[in-house]
């Protein structure tokens, strides 16, 4: 199983790409931590594959100094908690570790630095602009080639400007820079959102593209202070996570609907470990029952007239809480939202809706020729350090369900995710489906070009999309049923499409699937043995 399934990609990286460093993983392999595994790190990686670069651990995955040093590890990341000079000196003095082992590690590190020019070249080439046009082009090409067209009923796509005159874009994902969390989360110099890209290409073709918020945020009901005529929230920004001391800055925010992944834009506030307090006066124009929605990543609290009605002051992935109350027209209500950002994703979203007030959204969807619904995952729901659910995040499932229920206008779904999601509940209602993955800073431009036919979608699925999570070949061994913290890969070589071939289960979309805007004829085909 190792040689046939798991090793080939790593072996190719070592022998064909000539990588300079390799990282060991967190898990046990046949009962031994991979960071301490002499057969894996020495016999296979060094002796069989010929790797002579730096072998480092993943962050915090080194458990003991001596077995890691003897097993072949060169560098413990991040801080050398286990394999450090003091610990190594102790085992050398005891005679458990030979100095030649240390020399070998130093050699691996130095020869790699020399090979890559780190010892004799400047590491900053100032002739390359930070916002490099060549990099922008590469990012755009990758986004164009990576998106996969999965469904296209009656050739709705590409959108034809002689028939399609008005397009509605819905979903918060259309406005955000989208990326997975953890190490995959980077801050681009600039980015083009899905909405910006669709609107720009549409304008070139004389098509009106507008964004429709699935929620009526009722922004006209909120004012920065008592007696003020200025709409918005008075924001106080603190460079700590507990709102202590004086704010480093104050400003008026028109609404609270932020993805601060690229920073708040407030000088003195970084991308982590800060807090914000927003205050405003709410003056509802109509009597009725209202629902307050507050969510984010990390902690958040809501006060109405100094009463704490939502309290989730905890780190964690994006989630939402609601509070319902009756409001009276002409009465004023003091609103206060508190938020803190630790590390990772930085999302805060606050809005309120009048119960049953969906008329505007429904009318807007039915006043266009096509609806582009952008939904899926982002850095708040899909990251390292934990597996996401197969189901969509609740707010994303709510969005696509709401769109489907409110309109008969053709719907094209654009999904951002690093893998498959549950789609049995909504896929049949969509006329088109484009899997965007996480397309990077130029994803919006690429999406607009593909939707309007300037670019032919050519991406193919690199994995099989199952219909149900229970259909996946790994399902039966995924859960730690006996709570011993060990998982046996019982599927063996029957992972991915091999597993579906073996089980005979019907899949949603097979490995290698992907539609385009043209047709192909194959002739005079021959097959030769491998």
Write out the residue ranges for each language-model feature:
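Residues that scaffold the ATP/ADP-binding catalytic core of kinase and kinase-like folds
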Residues: 312
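Glycoside hydrolase catalytic-domain context in secreted enzymes
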Residues: 1-289, 298, 305-306, 315-530
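A short beta-loop-beta micro-motif enriched in histidine and acidic residues
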Residues: 295
């Amino acid at each position: 199983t190792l040689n046939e399934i798991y090793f080939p990609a790593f072996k190719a990286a070592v022998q064909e790409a000539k990588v300079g460093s390799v990282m060991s993983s967190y898990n046990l392999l046949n009962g031994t931590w991979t960071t301490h595994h002499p057969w894996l790190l020495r016999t296979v990686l060094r002796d069989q594959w010929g790797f002579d670069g730096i072998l480092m651990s993943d962050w915090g995955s080194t458990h003991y100094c001596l077995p890691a040093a003897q097993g072949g590890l060169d560098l413990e990341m991040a801080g050398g908690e286990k394999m450090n000079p003091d610990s190594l000196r102790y085992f050398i003095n005891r005679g458990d570790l030979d100095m030649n082992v240390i020399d070998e590690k130093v050699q691996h590190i130095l020869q790699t630095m020399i090979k890559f020019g780190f010892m004799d070249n400047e590491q900053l080439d100032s002739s390359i602009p930070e916002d490099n046009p060549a990099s922008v082009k590469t990012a755009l090409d990758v986004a164009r080639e990576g998106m996969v067209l999965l469904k296209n009923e009656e050739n709705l796509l590409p959108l034809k400007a002689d028939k399609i005159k008005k397009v509605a874009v819905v979903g918060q994902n259309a406005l955000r820079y989208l990326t997975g969390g953890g190490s995959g989360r980077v801050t681009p110099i600039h980015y083009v959102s899905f909405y910006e890209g669709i609107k720009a290409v549409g304008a070139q073709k004389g098509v009106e593209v507008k964004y429709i918020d699935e929620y009526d945020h009722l922004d006209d009901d909120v004012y920065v202070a008592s007696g003020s005529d200025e709409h918005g929230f008075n924001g106080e920004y603190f460079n700590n996570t507990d709102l202590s001391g004086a704010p480093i800055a104050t400003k008026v925010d028109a609404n609270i609907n932020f993805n601060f992944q690229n920073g708040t834009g407030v000088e003195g506030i970084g991308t982590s470990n800060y807090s914000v307090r927003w205050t405003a006066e709410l003056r509802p124009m109509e009597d009725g029952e209202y629902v307050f929605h507050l969510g984010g990543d990390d902690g958040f609290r809501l006060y109405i007239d100094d009463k704490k009605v939502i309290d989730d002051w905890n780190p964690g992935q994006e989630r939402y809480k609601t509070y319902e109350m009756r409001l009276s027209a002409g009465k004023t209500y003091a609103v206060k939202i508190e938020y803190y950002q630790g590390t990772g994703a930085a999302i805060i979203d606050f809005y309120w809706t009048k119960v049953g007030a969906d008329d505007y959204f429904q009318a807007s969807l039915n006043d266009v020729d096509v609806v582009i619904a952008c939904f899926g995952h982002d850095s708040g729901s899909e990251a390292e350090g934990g597996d996401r659910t197969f189901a969509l995040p609740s707010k994303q499932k709510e969005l696509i369900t709401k769109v489907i229920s409110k309109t008969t206008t053709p719907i094209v779904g654009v999904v951002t995710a690093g893998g498959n999601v549950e789609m049995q509940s909504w896929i049949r209602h969509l006329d088109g489906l484009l899997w965007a993955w996480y397309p990077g800073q130029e994803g919006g431009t690429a999406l607009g070009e593909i939707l309007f036919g300037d670019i032919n979608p050519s991406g193919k699925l690199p994995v099989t999309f199952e219909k149900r999570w229970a259909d996946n070949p790994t399902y039966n061994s995924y859960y730690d049923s006996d709570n011993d913290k060990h998982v046996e890969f019982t599927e063996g070589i029957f992972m991915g499409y091999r597993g579906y071939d073996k089980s005979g289960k019907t899949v949603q979309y097979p490995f290698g699937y992907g539609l385009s805007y043209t047709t192909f004829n194959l002739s005079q085909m021959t097959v030769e043995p491998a």
